[in-house]
From Swiss-Prot:
GO molecular function: heme binding; metal ion binding; tryptophan 2,3-dioxygenase activity
Matching InterPro entries: Trp/Indoleamine_2_3_dOase-like (IPR037217), Trp_2_3_dOase (IPR004981)
The enzyme's E.C. designation: 1.13.11.11
Protein name: Tryptophan 2,3-dioxygenase
Record organism: Drosophila yakuba (Fruit fly)
Length: 379
């Protein structure tokens, strides 16, 4: 019996016969691989001094830019869905799915850095002279990602000029300007949080109930501290309770909160912060499950961008040290290190929510009125 997988000269080879009569494109045409795979122009090769690792350098950065394009595509679709007065649960599920996709892409980008680190500093030096004045600072797509996410111009670290001035192309500058004007993910999430059901003073009034719970919690802490037999320990506990009281005052007093926003220490409006805290407390409720996932994914995105920046900083220090200027004229390592601060963390308030937690048993219970309202599928 002949092997069904083995061909012979007498059999008709139908491997090239189309499986469909529909008009379409073959794999290479559809992906435009002729353009994609012909876009690696090694300047060292043009100079008749080819450096092997320049090819890796180009491929890695092109891969970054392709993934940046996909992140922008996802962010734009998410922003479109959030830019509505009412968002039903099916939309929330889709937003969560796409944010999760961005998280996985960013994890991949973080993991790409070690591949570039297989190149030694001497290997990099062999072709670094060809890179000037090019610089990662000139990545238009990364700047668009930052702006669409919600990095504010006034929060940026300046190195020797405004970040948008590195782009000589007017079309690129227009893209930057438009991304600064358009509602960012931060702004749209803030609007969405401000509509959290249960914040209404005429309804459940979560914020008033939360303040009452905090007051009772701190009063119980004071009573417990007063029973401490050791004077020094008692004073220490009372001092710690007063510090916590001041922390809570920073969210309960709108004037204090607004001052922190002006200073750049907070990002959300006062009401949006209330919504985020409420979702965090009641995340086990079916209605708040997806919103809580959404907030968690936003923190994941912030964290992964920070990790990517950190890995980039370490790689730059390893390749060129901490004193040399970058190829684009920036302060290189020093500038990149400065971007690791909280000023570049867009959803900083979400990271700090744990500061305001109270024990589970102290969380105000939901009444029947709010439970019925939470059955409504839209916010």
């Amino acid at each position: 019996m002949s092997c069904p997988y083995a061909g012979n000269g007498n059999e008709h080879d139908d491997s090239a016969v189309p499986l469909t009569t529909e008009v379409g494109k073959i794999y290479g045409e559809y992906l435009m691989l002729d353009k994609l795979l012909d876009a690696q122009c090694m300047l060292s090769e043009e100079d008749k001094r080819p450096v092997h690792d320049e090819h890796l350098f180009i491929i890695t950065h092109q891969a970054y830019e392709l993934w940046f394009k996909q992140i922008i595509f996802e962010f734009d679709s998410i922003r479109d869905m959030l830019d509505a007065e009412v968002i039903d649960e099916t939309k929330t599920l889709e937003i969560v799915k796409r944010l999760h996709r961005v998280v996985l892409i960013l994890k991949l980008l973080v993991d790409q850095v070690p591949i570039l680190e297989t190149m030694t500093p001497l290997d990099f030096m062999d072709f670094r002279k060809y890179l000037a004045p090019a610089s990662g600072f000139q990545s238009l797509q990364f700047r668009l990602i930052e702006n669409k996410l919600g990095v504010l111009t006034e929060q940026r670290v300046r190195y020797n000029q405004k970040y948008s001035d590195v782009f000589s192309d007017e079309e690129a500058r227009n893209s930057i300007r438009n991304s600064e004007k358009d509602p960012s993910l931060l702004e749209l999430v803030q609007r969405w949080l401000e509509r959290t059901p249960g914040l209404e003073e005429s309804g459940f009034n979560f914020w008033a109930k939360f303040q009452e719970s905090v007051d009772r919690f701190l009063a119980a802490q004071v009573q417990s501290a007063m029973e401490e037999p050791v004077e020094k320990a008692k004073n220490y506990r009372l001092m710690d309770i007063e510090k916590r009281r001041e922390v809570y005052r920073s969210i309960f007093d709108p004037a204090v909160h607004d001052a922190l926003v002006r200073r750049g220490d907070r990002r959300f409006s006062h009401r949006a912060l209330q919504g985020a805290i409420m979702i965090t407390f009641y995340r086990d409720e079916p209605r708040f499950s997806q919103p809580h996932q959404l907030l968690t994914l936003l923190m994941d995105i912030d964290s992964l961008i920070t990790k990517w920046r950190y890995n980039h900083v370490i790689m730059v220090q390893r390749m060129i040290g901490s004193q040399q200027l970058g190829t684009g004229g920036s302060s290189g390592y020093q500038y990149l290190r400065s971007t690791l601060s909280d000023r570049y963390k867009v959803f900083l308030d979400l990271f700090n929510l744990s500061t305001f937690l109270i024990p589970r048993e102290a969380i105000p219970p939901l009444d029947e009125t709010i439970r019925k309202k939470l059955i409504n599928k839209s916010v």
